[in-house]
Amino acid sequence: MDFELGDRIRIEKDGNTYEGIVMPSNTDHIVVKMVSGYNAGVDPEGASITLLEKAGPKNAPKAKPDKAKGQKKLPKVTILSTGGTIASKVDYRTGAVTAQFSADDIVDAIPELTEIADINGRVLYNILSENMKAEYWTELAGAVAQEIENGADGIIIAHGTDTMMYSAAALSFMLKTPVPVVFVGSQRSADRPSSDNAMNAICATKVAVSDIAEVCVVMHDTTSDDRCAIHFGTKVRKMHTSRRDAFQSINSDPIGYIDHSTHKIETVLPFSKRDSQKLELKNTLEPKCSLVKFVPGANPDVLSYYIDSGYKGLVIEGTGLGHVSTDWIPNIKRATENGIPVIMTSQCISGRVCDRVYDTGRDILKAGAIEGEDMLPEVALVKLMWALGQSNDVDEIKEIMRSNIGHEMTDSTLK
């Protein structure tokens, strides 16, 4: 056949037409990634195949230094590109979505951004967000602080959605910011007609020039292209694998909303206003912490592994109000007696941990565990990593974990 992996072809068979990029496939079928983003496998026997465009690895876009620029009289906004779907297209070699594009490419694709702000771009990473690590959070927070010190009026962080809530939580603890720091992503790549990248990026840029001096996440609020929600970085969670409105505030309202057509921002909750606090960076983390999910019948030796392996902190995602089976309690006590903080959270996600209602919970507290209040388990993990990076004193770490640092705890839960 006169086509290769990565070429764009048209297949006509049995009255149907399939057009897309050739993906790796077995010998029996040709697999193409269509413009919709979905894959189609077609038996080539009896099919008419037309080569539309040659495209090989040599033509695949490469990450490059960023020189994105807007208009000089507008507020200065820096886009820090870390990769993810908002900065991705279909890879010409495999047909899969890869993170190869920079802030320059985002601005080229969405020129409306330059009407809102003087855009500068900087590539930090070009990775899919499942490859994020604690060391990257440390570098990212440092890069944000550097851009603010250099005069940026707002920061946008282009990030993959899968682990965005972890990164947003990390920066919420590591930074006090006088300007907006806005995480934004996309559930669907720019190649797809249903992509949410343009609207999300435009709304994020408007928030970046607003008075909301918080680390926040801006994503679709509904499945329609009507408005985006502005979430605190510590109260947001990805609640669906693929829907455009996957991000929701948990145990809290969003900070507010931004209308896509009017760009008007409506705030719901109090927030730190622009220039109300000085820039402060505390980006030391202790990566040797873990989030442990309890399930019925789970062997308590799971905790022994972490204790014996030298882990510095543990977050347990318990049932209901924050429970584990009674045979886990001795190992919780062993951990705390060895100076390892243990934080109890709930796999219910919504609601508040309270280990004073039932006997099991009371025994967990007697073993030295700390109630995680209404913190999301993932946020509690990141906060514990940060707390351990700030102090070696167990009592001080406990006090940090019980304190509301970056909106991660609410006085009362809504639902």
Swiss-Prot record:
An example Gene Ontology biological process: regulation of translational fidelity
Species name: Methanococcoides burtonii (strain DSM 6242 / NBRC 107633 / OCM 468 / ACE-M)
Domain of life, per lineage: Archaea
Disulphide bridges: none
Catalytic residue list: T85, T161, D162, K238
Keywords: ATP-binding, Ligase, Nucleotide-binding, Protein biosynthesis
Protein name per its UniProtKB record: Glutamyl-tRNA(Gln) amidotransferase subunit D
Domain Asparaginase/glutaminase: 75-404
Complex formation: Heterodimer of GatD and GatE.
EC number(s) per entry: 6.3.5.-
